[in-house]
Amino acid sequence: MQGQTTSVSFDGREIRLTTGRYAPQAGGSVLIECGDTAVLVTATQGQGREGADFLPLSCDYEERLYAAGRIPGSFMRREGRPPERATLISRLIDRPLRPLFPNWMRDDIQVVATCLSLDERVPADILAVTGSSMATLLAGIPFYGPMAAVRVGLLGDDFVLNPSFREIERGDLDLVVAGTPDGVVMVEAGSNQLTEQDVIEAIDFGYEAVNELIKAQESILKDSGLTQIKPEKPDLDETVPSYLEKNCTKPISALLKEFDLSKEDRDLKLDEIKTNCAEKIDSLKDDNAVKKSITTNTKLLGISFKALTKKLMREQIIKDGKRVDGRALDEVREISAEAGILPKRVHGSGLFQRGLTQVLSTATLGTPSDAQEMDDLNPSPDKTYIHHYNFPPYSVGETRPMRTPGRREVGHGALAERAIIPVLPPKESFPYVLRVVSEVLSSNGSTSMGSVCGSTIALLDAGVPLKAPVSGAAMGLIKEGEEVRILTDIQGIEDFLGDMDFKVAGTEKGITALQMDMKMTGLPIKIIGEAINQAKPARTHILEKMVQAIDKPRETLSPHAPRLLSFRIDPELIGTVIGPGGRTIKGITERTNTKIDIEDGGIVTIASHDGVAAEEAQKIIEGLTRKVHEGEVFTGSITRIIPIGAFVEILPGKEGMIHISQLSEARVEKVEDVVKVGDEVTVRVREIDNRGRINLTLRGIPQNGDMQYYPQPTPTPVAPLM
């Protein structure tokens, strides 16, 4: 099958969409390519789920190692559980796609994106997002699309569209923006403390390119002879919503104005109103239309009650400018922060609370060997900063089985991780591998931003010299027609009733991470800019509270944290330190009880809980790699004797040999007549042969114990020895 191919060019980079050729039994499919990266995206619609009160949409990004010319390293030589990055890309597809389906839709929809080939210069994620829209359109699924996504980088002062992996690494911005003809529907970014204006301009720059990809999808649909199926709301039974509006509006509205109520009390009173209403309906005659509807659909009362509560809350915010807890639209909840709340067995800890949201973060310092190896398709180095986010059921007063982290936990952890990375100290000056774990102890909105704040406190408590502290706030939005209200620091109920969840993290200087999700089909850049700017004073206020808890890194590390020494050796001498079969480096680690890591560039990192042991290991390695010159004089101990001479350790780990003829001016019959093992002697380097062997002499050297060292390289400690 030939299929149809449409191309769109950006700055000399061409994106190709091929339809009608692959996966003919899928509802819709497209092969989307850029360079040598190719992603096959399919969308298929199933039957509706009976009794479902949500959209059963699943989005899966599948990596195949053959895409990078590799064979899996597992025993079965088959791909196993998706790596973390695949999970994050699955979320990246889901987030802009989900709000474009009608909220009444209950059909199973499955989108599968499979990376068939990966070019090291072209990331596959944005291709998968755009492809998901094209496949959905071709499948004939009711959909408020088209939707497309692009990536924006910043090199110097110039924005770069769809940058390569290397350009992303070198640049100060990694921003993904997805949009529809109505506006922006999703934003995700990490940046190197960029200003609010820079980020807004980057979103605007990206959205212009999004429109080109939207036009390409519309063209493909037209050329295929297909018509986009626009969602049409089915006729719904309005008897129950009408009854609730008539009988429950007053008590709900009155309750929403009781600003002093706690979340728990408000929820209980709402349940009371719903229960009273249900009892009234139950007392109606059996042939009453409302009672019949409730009997037919047992979930209808709960769904309709939630919808009415949501409507009344939104009206209160739009008309009165007051939220359910009485806060002004730009007001942050009460904040508390505390550092070092756990014993120093934990290297660093911080407790951050904002309203009813409470997060405990811990920081652990590890050695270079603790870095996380990234076993995925992307050409990425090992991770030296890791953030894990846990959301146990008790945090929302519920019970459920404790399982492995889900997509939400992985996504929130990645966002908090991205927010901190720009302020981490350089590896050369602080070579620790860092792991932060954020335990959500109580949740009422914005736990991911609470994790960012808790991480900062824990890292400073652990003695990590951050460039600047980072805080975060979640922004919300209520939009009714032309009326727009932006909410600062949204809580759980406002996330439910609102149209946007916009998380912004950064330092006093600028933004380090942001993530925007919509429940609308698009939002103008102007409103997005207002939300970003409104987040700045909130972040500053939160930072001030955090600094009161801890304003700089601890001067001393936990006594239970490893001590690291780092210095550089000639890369050509790495083999000398490692030795045949690793014998030399193994001997050093056993002798000094340390852990030693050597990078390809020659950076040696020694880890030990004993600073003296680390220094001893450093001296041995420096001795092994130090160049010895003819004529130098050393004092060392006799380590072993052979019939033709004696070996002397002239430097830690480095030996030379005194030939029997060089032991004395006089003739020597037996080596032991002059020296024995353990004797301390002063020797001169007579020559270094072409195999690097050091030949020594005792002739003419006064044996008075004097030592003369060739100038030693000055070690560069990366963390203080304590």
Curated annotation (Swiss-Prot):
Location of this chain's protein in the cell: Cytoplasm
Location, primary (coarse class): cytoplasm
Keywords: Cytoplasm, Magnesium, Metal-binding, Nucleotidyltransferase, RNA-binding, Transferase
Listed InterPro entries: ExoRNase_PH_dom1, ExoRNase_PH_dom2, ExoRNase_PH_dom2_sf, KH_dom, KH_dom_type_1, KH_dom_type_1_sf, NA-bd_OB-fold, PNPase
Enzyme category, top tier: transferase
Gene Ontology terms for molecular function: 3'-5'-RNA exonuclease activity; magnesium ion binding; polyribonucleotide nucleotidyltransferase activity; RNA binding
Domain S1 motif: 631-699
GO (cellular component) term, any one: cytosol
Needed co-factor(s): Mg(2+)
Family named by the database record: Belongs to the polyribonucleotide nucleotidyltransferase family.
UniProt cross-references to NCBIfam families, sorted A to Z: polynuc_phos, PRK11824.1
Role, per record: Involved in mRNA degradation. Catalyzes the phosphorolysis of single-stranded polyribonucleotides processively in the 3'- to 5'-direction.
Record-given protein name: Polyribonucleotide nucleotidyltransferase
Annotated source species: Prochlorococcus marinus (strain SARG / CCMP1375 / SS120)
